[in-house]
């Protein structure tokens, strides 16, 4: 797909005004966010050129691998965590903060996110539907007990006894959707309902190429929602969007907030 990168100065002010007006008058507005929202926080994209999956084999993080070789799965997961975060401590950027501001001002009802970084929560957004889970927790595969991931990962990194285990004896795993696993029904059902009921649907920083999340803007558009796509690259949903803003999300979203 073409990569037509523009700055905020290349976006027609009338388009920004139109998006702001749509949000101002909407009864229900929803945002779907992808990796492009978090790259400005220093988190690399998983897909695309030089993405994480270009350097790490996704098969190493498949559900089958966890079942067959939990120690190897965890060793590779520690390596993946280092590749993603290294020495950085990611913080919310202007895009996360703008979405939180839209919600606080009553112009956004929920954020549906494909990201697992927890930065929408950190920015102060109250209603976040984490479609792929979150790396900030681990969950016991047997009893479902959840713990803070940072503590467990630090203990695992300092131990030769992998995988980390719950008090019940079950194996802890990242509280994310692994390859080979379906998206949680509760999260997906809520996301579909919000998309269907929305008057405005913002698709922000997502290639809209990964199902089933990529179906959400389609559901919204079919329900007569005003679809707005904010992404550097073309997406499969551009043709059905009322507005396509091909510019930096950390510039576009604050510019919309300023107009409200």
Swiss-Prot record:
Protein name, as recorded: NAD-dependent protein deacetylase
InterPro entries: DHS-like_NAD/FAD-binding_dom (IPR029035), NAD-dep_sirtuin_deacylases (IPR050134), Sirtuin (IPR003000), Sirtuin_cat_small_dom_sf (IPR026591), Sirtuin_class_U (IPR028628), Ssirtuin_cat_dom (IPR026590)
HAMAP family (UniProt xref): Sirtuin_ClassU
Localization per Swiss-Prot or TrEMBL: Cytoplasm
Deacetylase sirtuin-type domain: residues covered: 9-260
Its EC number(s): 2.3.1.286
Function: NAD-dependent protein deacetylase which modulates the activities of several enzymes which are inactive in their acetylated form. Deacetylates the N-terminal lysine residue of Alba, the major archaeal chromatin protein and that, in turn, increases Alba's DNA binding affinity, thereby repressing transcription.
Organism field: Haloarcula marismortui (strain ATCC 43049 / DSM 3752 / JCM 8966 / VKM B-1809)
Main location: cytoplasm
Catalytic activity of the protein: N(6)-acetyl-L-lysyl-[protein] + NAD(+) + H2O = 2''-O-acetyl-ADP-D-ribose + nicotinamide + L-lysyl-[protein]
